[in-house]
């Protein structure tokens, strides 16, 4: 069955290698729109992300390395997981060379695989509510601190690139008080699965 929620060009592409992440966070972030993220078989197509650079006051790494953010200072292509407001886990991908401490927050995806399990984890039926926000996404995919520092090109993760470049929109990031004006949130144009619509 054709999934009309996702352009055909965004169907499962080649597996992303570490070199994909060893680039500027501002290149990696929009390039992740349309990629497919699976965690032990559950997941879907990424439709919203945010970039965080080490020179960015909103980045966890801005004040220097701590036990909590140490993974950000490591090699690219690994998961950086933290708890937001002491409640929700959030999944990020570390970018650029080791020591640069930049990452992309995965904010939303279109659920395509393992929907029954994701619904049980989230306690909701509406597929648009399963992964439309970083906390929801991590809960749906079963991501916890146990995934912190794990390589994204090896189980339990599977991350595949898109087959063609989609239409991408950009705007200010959400829920931050510092550098809130920077247009470092990226999304798939017209997607109903993002956490908040983009102003166009």
From Swiss-Prot:
Keyword line: DNA damage, DNA repair, Hydrolase
Pfam family, one: Pur_DNA_glyco
CDD domains tied to this protein: AAG
Swiss-Prot/TrEMBL GO biological process terms: base-excision repair
Keyword field contains Hydrolase: yes
EC number: 3.2.2.-
Keyword check for Hydrolase: yes
Extent of the signal sequence: none
Molecular function via GO: alkylbase DNA N-glycosylase activity; DNA binding
Domain of life according to the entry: Bacteria
Gene3D superfamilies, per database record: Methylpurine-DNA glycosylase (MPG) (3.10.300.10)
HAMAP family (alphabetical): 3MGH (MF_00527)
UniProt similarity note: Belongs to the DNA glycosylase MPG family.
NCBIfam families linked to this entry: 3mg, PRK00802.1-3
Name the UniProt record assigns to this protein: Putative 3-methyladenine DNA glycosylase
Species name: Rhodopseudomonas palustris (strain BisB18)
């Amino acid at each position: 069955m054709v999934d009309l929620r996702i352009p055909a060009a965004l169907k499962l592409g080649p597996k992303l290698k570490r070199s994909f992440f060893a680039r500027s966070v501002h290149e990696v972030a929009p390039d992740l729109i349309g990629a497919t993220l699976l965690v032990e078989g559950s997941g879907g197509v990424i439709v919203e992300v945010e970039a965080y650079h080490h020179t960015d006051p909103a980045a966890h790494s801005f004040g220097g390395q701590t036990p909590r953010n140490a993974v950000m200072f490591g090699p690219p292509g690994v998961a950086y997981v933290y708890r937001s407001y002491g409640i929700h886990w959030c999944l990020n991908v570390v970018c650029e060379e080791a020591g640069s401490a930049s990452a992309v927050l995965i904010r939303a995806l279109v659920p395509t695989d393992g929907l029954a399990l994701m619904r049980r984890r989230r306690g909701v039926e509406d597929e648009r509510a399963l992964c439309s926000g970083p906390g929801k996404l991590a809960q749906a995919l079963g991501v916890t601190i146990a995934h912190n520092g794990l390589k994204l090109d090896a189980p339990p993760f599977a991350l595949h690139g898109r087959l063609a470049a989609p239409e991408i929109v950009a705007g200010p990031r959400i829920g931050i008080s510092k550098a809130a004006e920077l247009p470092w949130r990226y999304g798939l144009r017209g997607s109903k699965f993002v956490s908040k619509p983009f102003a166009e």
